[in-house]
């Protein structure tokens, strides 16, 4: 069974989470992006604006990946402005017809008591079918590598 871990990252936290999951389950890893530099404070503000207004016009996977050659795809993305990032949602919408039957979501966020599961499950509408599983990983003041490992172990 081939698995691909796809991720978008602004600060490398989601990248670390997804690389950890990939290492544990023996998956390939690839990054997706809209091609914009979203580093620093202004990058964050722009990212939040794009998420609230859903203004991501393009998204692509950096490496040439044939999604249909995978049995499972795990899509990692951060939370921006209290919801899964617009780039992640754009990826699901654009590539939904190419996704394998098993798709999982990994959403990283700074914290609080909100686990964002209602908003994560809403992404199934973009996918056009229910996802196979989801996890919400808090990264602030939390061992997110350990938490991602616990999720990965459920996939083995």
Language-model segments: what does each one mean?
Residues 87-93, 118-121, 147-152:
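Charged helix-capping and loop-helix junction motifs
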Residues 1-73, 82-85, 128-130, 153-156:
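N-terminal beta1-alpha1-beta2 submodule of the flavodoxin-like/Rossmannoid cofactor-binding fold
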Residues 130-156:
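Glycine-rich phosphate/pyrophosphate-binding loop and the adjoining helix
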Residues 67-68, 93-102, 127:
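Short, conserved loop/helix-junction motifs that constitute active-site signature segments
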Residues 104-140:
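Short, glycine-/small-residue-rich phosphate/pyrophosphate-handling segment
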Residues 40-44, 117-118, 146-147:
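Short aromatic-enriched loop/helix-cap "lid" or pocket-rim segments at secondary-structure transitions
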Residues 9-11, 79, 107-110:
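Residue-level signal for short, function-critical loop segments
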């Amino acid at each position: 069974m081939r698995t691909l871990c796809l991720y978008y990252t602004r600060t490398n936290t989601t990248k670390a989470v997804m690389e950890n999951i990939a290492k544990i389950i023996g998956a390939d890893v690839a990054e997706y992006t809209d091609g914009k530099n979203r580093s620093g404070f202004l990058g964050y503000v722009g990212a939040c604006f794009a998420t609230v207004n859903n203004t991501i016009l393009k998204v692509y996977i950096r490496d040439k990946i044939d999604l249909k050659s995978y049995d499972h795809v795990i899509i990692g993305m951060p939370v921006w402005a209290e919801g899964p990032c617009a780039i992640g949602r754009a990826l699901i919408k654009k590539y939904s017809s190419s996704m394998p039957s098993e798709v999982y979501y990994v959403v990283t966020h700074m914290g609080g008591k909100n686990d964002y599961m209602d908003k994560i499950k809403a992404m199934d509408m973009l996918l056009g079918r229910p996802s196979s599983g989801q996890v919400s990983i808090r990264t602030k003041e939390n061992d997110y590598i350990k938490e991602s490992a616990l999720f990965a172990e459920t996939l083995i």
